[in-house]
Amino acid sequence: MAYDTNNIFAKILRGEIPCIKLFEDEHTLAFMDIMPQAEGHALVIPKEAATTLFELSDAAAAACMATVRRIGTAQKKGLGAEGIVLMQLNGEAAGQTVPHLSLIHI
């Protein structure tokens, strides 16, 4: 799966599609999923164009994990969650449907 600059996450990053932002910094964006599987279902995406984890720079990967930890901490505190699920799919064989890396909090 090649990177597509018109994928839905790229459009969200460019502000072409609205989202409910939870957090944004220089390297990442965290927002609510439009079809949540559970209360607090959020996505963390890098601003770097990368389809899979294997294409992501080390700096962007570190920034993503810092944002994941920030959002997970907020979910635990704000929702009273005792734990979170963190999922990341790489490639069509793994179930990835959008050609932009995402980390999923449920």
Predicted regions and their residues:
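HIT superfamily nucleotide-processing domains
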Residues: 1-104
